[in-house]
């Protein structure tokens, strides 16, 4: 066992003395058992994590009963919703790297034999997953589970995005102070990751398809007693994985990655999933390129539409309708789309995991013969405005905006854009451009939920597009094109735009362009001043110096895979 490094031999007497002092070691027999890290992300700032302390307790008890010695440790987390719209959002994506590094540090410093990862929200799941693949010891993921959708007294279903959009509606006097307060008080009824197909739930669903979590991980509610049972099962499984030395790189292969992207496209997941899955692929040393995604999306039907694409369906409905397993089973009917032989932490193949699943409500999970669209709910756009690509959640774009040409309204930061939207500077037909908000320029590639929600709330969702080198919340909807690469801070073409430039977005053709010649773009860029970092001290200053493009997952410059092709 790896842990023998810190517990076997006369020379490890000091180590054993310290281990005994923790209270976790209760007898000399414990040194013969595998040391299992319970990597928890409990904190009281994130509603998706406020209940994880109890899940950690359950995991520890079950690991001990199964023959392991559990050591719980915590890592940080950021609530994207609370961090939204201020300096805090610049720390959100950057926290992913801190989480990965901190988990790696604890696991390697203490020579743990296996890990039970208990994440839930946006950057915590991918951060832990990056660390797990980096250290490559047996691991299993079991998330905290999704939040229930909220309901107003009149029976209307609401969620966090309802509140953000209500702010825009309130600014136009469409709703009263009291109506806004009613939505605010009912949208988030309890613990769990926010209730739609936002980033947290997207990543926790993808964990099943990647093979690193048990069936049900992505959809069983935080408040459902089955969630505790899932934690127990996962905690027993880690002992099996340690004994068989089944490691995450044995599971997360290229075929598992493609399975996960197929699920992502079928559910119209958050655009952030692309960012995170590319980063995870890098840690697994899989040579996967951004440009491959459109070919996969082209053969993956969009069969499960969930909030924010529709307020009629939330994650609890997906669970009731059969969950991720039912979606994967339906997709498996398409020849060659999924690799059902992919191994999983259950000890079974993906095909065996989903064999008993069924669609229980075709209004929630459609069949492949009756999809919302024949192609997936996410797409990568290319053109002279995004030579290295940009990402759009096609499943949340209204039909009228799938093709759009309009004049640019350019803003060099998110705050100015929000002000412009609220002050009616933005008119129907415009293309809002928010730049210098990329991984380096932001820094931290902040989410644009506030401006997209303001656009929707002010009734402009069917007539205004927004493009940015930043990113979007999983809750954003509308013609929102993000991750524009190269970013403005790297002198990408988006930096050359001026007010009035005509921008054409053609989502079916997967293109995004500005009506300028290459020469004109280059001439404008040559006249730009050298980019001046916005933050010059602390973690974000270091992050900005090391972070790479969104098209490589915004990973740090420590890998041979981090340069765009």
From Swiss-Prot:
The modification N6-carboxylysine is found at residue 123. One of its GO terms (molecular function) is dihydroxy-acid dehydratase activity. It catalyses: (2R)-2,3-dihydroxy-3-methylbutanoate = 3-methyl-2-oxobutanoate + H2O; (2R,3R)-2,3-dihydroxy-3-methylpentanoate = (S)-3-methyl-2-oxopentanoate + H2O. It is an enzyme of class 4 (lyase). Its EC number is 4.2.1.9. Gene3D superfamilies: IlvD/EDD C-terminal domain-like (3.50.30.80). GO terms for biological process: isoleucine biosynthetic process; L-valine biosynthetic process. [2Fe-2S] cluster binds at residues 121, 194. This is Dihydroxy-acid dehydratase. It comes from Chlorobium phaeobacteroides (strain DSM 266 / SMG 266 / 2430). The gene is ilvD.
